[in-house]
Design a protein with these regions (language model features):
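Hydrophobic residues at beta-strand termini and immediately following loops
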Residues: 65, 113, 186
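N-terminal, positively charged nucleic-acid-binding surface of large information/translation enzymes
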Residues: 10-15, 19-107
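Residue-level recognition of the N-termini of beta-strands and the immediately preceding loop/turn
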Residues: 62, 109-111, 225, 256-257
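Short, glycine/charge-rich beta-strand/loop segments that flank catalytic centers
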Residues: 68-72, 94-97, 107-122, 140-150
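Alpha-helical recognition segments enriched in aromatics with Gly/Pro capping
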Residues: 1-34, 45, 49, 121-259
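Short, amphipathic alpha-helical segments
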Residues: 87-91, 95, 113-123, 177-180, ...
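The substrate-binding groove and active-site-proximal loops of carbohydrate-active enzymes
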Residues: 80-86, 110-116, 203, 231
């Protein structure tokens, strides 16, 4: 009997039909390591663990990747408050995260990539999006994804941008841009970033939040894979932006079969 899985993309229960017979590739949005993970975070991580265990029980070969966000507005802000380097600060909370995982008996997945180890991949995707006319550089040196150029934007969250008011998650991710809906792929350096920056072909700065997951998922799982999990609060804008970036860069759809 074919396993059924609920797909947020279609709002339906569907037959689980992996791209490779007998093998399921999963990506889970992991923690931002700036504080202790809270109960809502753990609900998402426990769900992905149960899913992984059940798929293995059913005989599937599971390859599961969960990222660690170790550079963003929150990690920079709080590392400065504690007077620690970004690396030392994030290592502290990464260690605590894994200790808590063990307490909750959550199995380790195959890969735990860190955002800061994948800057090259983020730059390469951003350059590709610029070349394809899907991204642009603003006057302040930041690079943005042009949402209006991606015609299928909103297919996951079902949000109509004409009626969408700016949210905190959108506002906090942007500097100067052409449209309120556009989001940062690369943020130009500001003094408030302190020592956190990379000198790249995109200029001196750091990655936007959304590009991190596209870069890491595509590196380890390819341009299209089976299942993506994460908190419901990430459906918009984070997961919606992941789809736009990834499909815009690779030209392959769907980026993910089951959300």
């Amino acid at each position: 009997m074919v396993m059924k899985i609920y797909n947020t993309l279609t709002r339906k229960r569907e037959d689980l039909l992996p791209s490779e017979e007998g093998r399921v590739k999963i990506y889970s949005c992991g923690p931002t390591v700036y504080n202790y993970a809270h109960i809502g975070n753990w609900r998402s991580f426990i769900f992905s663990d149960i899913l992984r265990r059940y798929l293995k029980y059913k005989g599937y070969n599971v390859y599961h990747v969960m990222n660690l966000t170790d550079v963003d507005d929150k990690t920079i802000r709080d590392s400065q408050k504690e007077g620690m380097s970004l690396n030392d600060f994030c290592e502290k909370y990464t260690k605590i995260f894994f200790e808590d995982m063990d307490i909750l008996n959550i199995q380790r997945v195959e890969e735990y990539p860190k955002a800061t180890d994948h800057i090259k991949e983020m730059v390469d995707i951003t350059k590709s999006l610029i070349e394809k006319g899907l991204a642009y550089k603003s006057e302040d040196g930041s690079t943005y994804f042009s949402v209006s150029k991606f015609k299928e934007y909103g297919k996951l969250s079902k949000i109509k941008l004409d009626n969408q008011q700016s949210t905190e998650r959108i506002k906090n991710d942007e500097y100067e841009k052409d449209s309120a809906n556009d989001f940062a792929l690369w943020k130009s350096y500001e003094e408030s970033d302190g020592e956190v920056f990379w000198e790249t072909e995109l200029g001196k700065g750091r990655p936007g939040w959304h590009i991190e997951c596209s870069a890491m998922s595509m590196k380890y799982l390819g341009d299209s894979f089976d299942i993506h999990t994460g908190g419901i609060d990430l459906t918009f804008p984070h997961h919606e932006n992941e789809i736009a970036q990834s499909e815009g860069c690779s030209g392959v759809a769907p980026f993910v079969k089951y959300w």
